[in-house]
Regions:
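Generic structural signal for residues in well-ordered beta-strands
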Residues: 150-155
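Phosphate/pyrophosphate-binding loops at sites that engage ATP/ADP/AMP, CoA/4′-phosphopantetheine
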Residues: 94, 113-124
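Short helix-capping/linker segments at secondary-structure and domain boundaries
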Residues: 2, 39-44, 115-119, 177-187
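Glycine-rich phosphate-binding/hydrolytic loop that grips phosphoryl groups
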Residues: 106, 158-190
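Glycine-rich phosphate-binding loops at beta-strand->alpha-helix junctions
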Residues: 123-145
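Short beta-strand scaffold segments in enzyme catalytic cores
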Residues: 1-5, 9-14, 33-34
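A short acidic Gly-Thr/Ser loop motif
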Residues: 4-8, 26-28, 128-136
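Conserved ATP-utilizing enzyme core subdomain
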Residues: 21-109, 113, 185
Length: 190
């Protein structure tokens, strides 16, 4: 199972009896990166250090997770702006940046976890790809929830012969080659 954490988080896997499953799970790095640009004069939270230094507002995160998107089954898709309105929430804006970032990281992790919980079976391995794999706070939340099933970092990529940083670029090249060859580029459940 692959969780790709870019601006939008998405997951793809192959389930016995179901076939290929792929869908957007919710925010990836978008909300955290946008918050950093707006309020911290930085492009992103390097290694998730600011988020890790704060205290997440679990109650706020749970109210955000009540949004219909998180309970809707797959396939489903969204754009990086879909949850941008969360950055205007006064409950977030009144927090110090570390606590705001901690809350955004928990929201992102819990939205990913909610999507995994919708699967027919819990994946034995969850490979983390994309820039979000460098956010140690985000990874910590996922590891706390799914334990050793969560695999992040270059070791996984090297072992599987793909680059976790280049997953989307490699996928686009693969899909382009299939399109040129007149082959399908999608599956019914994606």
């Amino acid at each position: 199972w692959v969780a790709n954490l870019t601006g939008v988080a998405n997951q793809t896997g192959i389930e016995s009896g179901t076939g290929v499953i792929g869908f957007d799970t919710g925010p990836g790095n978008a909300l955290m990166d946008d918050y950093m640009r707006l309020y911290c004069d930085a492009d992103f939270d390097k290694d998730g250090a600011l988020a890790a230094s704060g205290i997440a507002d679990a109650t706020l995160v749970e109210t955000w997770l009540d949004e219909r998107y998180f309970t809707t089954g797959w396939p489903k898709s969204l754009d990086r702006q879909a949850f941008r309105h969360r950055l205007d929430d006064t409950r977030l804006l009144t927090k110090v940046p570390a606590d705001a970032m901690a809350s955004l990281a928990l929201f992102t992790a819990n939205s990913i976890a909610a999507a995994i919980d919708q699967l027919p079976a819990s994946p034995k391995t969850i490979l983390i790809a994309g820039g979000g794999r460098r956010n140690l706070c985000l990874l910590s939340h996922l590891q706390n929830r799914f334990g050793s099933a969560v695999q992040g970092g270059n070791i996984v990529g090297d072992r599987l012969l793909f680059s976790p940083d280049m997953l989307e670029a490699e996928l686009m090249a693969f899909l382009a080659a299939r399109h040129i060859a007149g082959l399908p580029t999608s599956f019914p459940a994606t």
